[in-house]
Swiss-Prot record:
<dbReference type="GO" id="GO:0008270">
    <property type="term" value="F:zinc ion binding"/>
</dbReference>
<feature type="modified residue" description="Phosphoserine">
    <location>
        <position position="46"/>
    </location>
</feature>
<feature type="modified residue" description="Phosphoserine">
    <location>
        <position position="124"/>
    </location>
</feature>
<feature type="region of interest" description="Disordered">
    <location>
        <begin position="534"/>
        <end position="557"/>
    </location>
</feature>
<feature type="region of interest" description="May be required for TORC1 activation">
    <location>
        <begin position="620"/>
        <end position="635"/>
    </location>
</feature>
<feature type="zinc finger region" description="FYVE-type; atypical">
    <location>
        <begin position="452"/>
        <end position="527"/>
    </location>
</feature>
<feature type="modified residue" description="Phosphoserine">
    <location>
        <position position="73"/>
    </location>
</feature>
<dbReference type="GO" id="GO:0032266">
    <property type="term" value="F:phosphatidylinositol-3-phosphate binding"/>
</dbReference>
<dbReference type="GO" id="GO:0007165">
    <property type="term" value="P:signal transduction"/>
</dbReference>
<feature type="binding site">
    <location>
        <position position="519"/>
    </location>
    <ligand>
        <name>Zn(2+) 2</name>
    </ligand>
</feature>
<feature type="binding site">
    <location>
        <position position="474"/>
    </location>
    <ligand>
        <name>Zn(2+) 2</name>
    </ligand>
</feature>
<feature type="binding site">
    <location>
        <position position="485"/>
    </location>
    <ligand>
        <name>Zn(2+) 1</name>
    </ligand>
</feature>
<feature type="region of interest" description="Disordered">
    <location>
        <begin position="1"/>
        <end position="110"/>
    </location>
</feature>
<feature type="modified residue" description="Phosphoserine">
    <location>
        <position position="381"/>
    </location>
</feature>
<dbReference type="GO" id="GO:1904263">
    <property type="term" value="P:positive regulation of TORC1 signaling"/>
</dbReference>
<dbReference type="GO" id="GO:1902485">
    <property type="term" value="F:L-cysteine binding"/>
</dbReference>
<feature type="region of interest" description="Disordered">
    <location>
        <begin position="123"/>
        <end position="181"/>
    </location>
</feature>
Amino acid sequence: MTALHSVSKTPAIKEEEEDGDERDGRGVPLGPRNHDYRGRKGDEESGADTVTSPITFEKKKIAPRASTHSEQSILSSISLKSMVNQHRQQQLQQESSTGAGTGFVDRKQQIQSPAMVSILRKNSAEENVRSSHSSKLGEGQIDGRKASASKEIGKTLPFTDDQRSNPELDPTNSVVDVSRGKNTKSKTVFNELEDDADDDDEVRQKNLTTQALRKLSSFKMNASSNLRLSKENKAKESSSSSTSSVSSSSTSKVENIVDKLTTTNSSSMSQLRFGNTNVIIDSVNHAAKPPHQQMLRKPSLEFLPQPASSTNLNFNSNKHKSNVRQISNPKKPLYIPAVLRKVSETNITNDDLLNATLSSYYKKASNLEHGFNPSKSQSASVQNANNLRIISSQSSVQSNTSSILESYKNKISSYLFPNSIPNSDRINLIPTISNRNSARVNPPTKDHWIPDSKRNSCRYCHKPFTLWERKHHCRHCGDIFCQDHLRHWLYLDSQANFIMINELNNGGINGGGTLCKICDDCLVEYENLSTTNHNANTNEDNINVEEGEDDDNDNRKKLRNYYKNRQMNALFRPKKGGSSQEHATVDRDTTTPIQVKSNDEEADNENTGGEQEEGNDVLGSVIGSVPANWNWSSF
């Protein structure tokens, strides 16, 4: 059965191929021939029921692919590109003759917009290649389509000639159905274009052609006007360069011409398409412009960012600077040690410290004297303790200001070079205390001083004087001592007499005093005098309730008499180290200070014994043994 089937199929297929070739030659449309084949071979198929219907194949003639562009678009592109190429060649020749050499764009425009120059050069190269290629392709298509001259410009749409892209518009397209059943038949479907769609396409194509022709005409007019104006400008520039001075009328004419050039250039703007964006560029012709206008000219590219105004930049920068904190601001530490602090911040001088120290010292001493009165309350003792604290603190402040070092320097210089410092300056070096209303107090007199040649050793310890152990005069007695036995300081007036505490508070006998060095013997004498004065004051306080203030005047008179007697008998004072006979003679002649005691006072002294004297001695030693400027750093 397989052999018969293969033999029976072979002549039928051959016959159908021959019939198809004949129909193709006569121009008859192709169609299936299944019914003819079935009519002739019906007996054979009826005899063999198992044999299926044969598969038929039809040949389809494929039409050649049409071009992607319409004839109208090809012609318009050829005409436009040819005109552009001619115009560019003319401009290149003019620039080469004038020596510009930049190509397409001025030098200042190249500096302002280098991206514009690169775009123009790239576009010119691409357009030249495209124009040459399109011209060749257009000529070949025109020669190939001369046979079918029935078509007119604008009647065919671009991208619609390809029959394969839209299968519904192809009249030769047919659908073949393959059937394996006995009663299946193939049918062909023919679709034709509608008349309304054809009319709309013709109207659109006509509008496109008219727009292309208008662009061509406007471009030709602009090119001719630009060439004419550029020639006129070159002629005027050459004439203006030959002449040395140009009148105001000529400058106005040149400005008018420049305005015309700008208007024509602005009208002759063209658009270039890069991808999906349209970029507006100036025309290729760039007429000569004055330098001030060329500096003001800016590139007209839409995609180039415009620089912001300078005022806005300055405002933003100033605003930014105001908000930023400076790094170099001076910083002050939270705490400054006492050593690093400036003395000027306290506004305290050395004189202020000295006066405060001395005044507080004598206030303390006077308070201690009045503190022995049993009628006083406990507030006096508290005040005395506070005064002692003030004295110690002020003494330490005085040492920090280095006043002691300065005083020692002045003293050393005065001892080594006594004639170098005048008496007026030497007086100023000695610290004094005086009333506010009184003049400066003169230093103690030196008339009672013993000459240096009279003693070769200390009067108290007999230590010989050498280069290292120097001689020191006591300002009160005038004798010569070593440094170890001349270390006390007390106030003396101009006659080298002691100034007591009460007198110092009242301004002193002579209106003030000077702080001077005294020996140990003079200190004992001062203590005895202070204790005597204290006893007299305490007794007078008890009597003043009845007698009044008459006793105060008596005490002052007694003190004055004491000083007069002391001055008279200063030469007859006994000296340590002398013989017993000398002491005896001196004791006979010397006078002691007058001590006035009442009967009640003598009785009190007899009852109490030596307890009160011991207490007074302790008080006197405390007052006189510590110098006024003593502090912890003087060891």
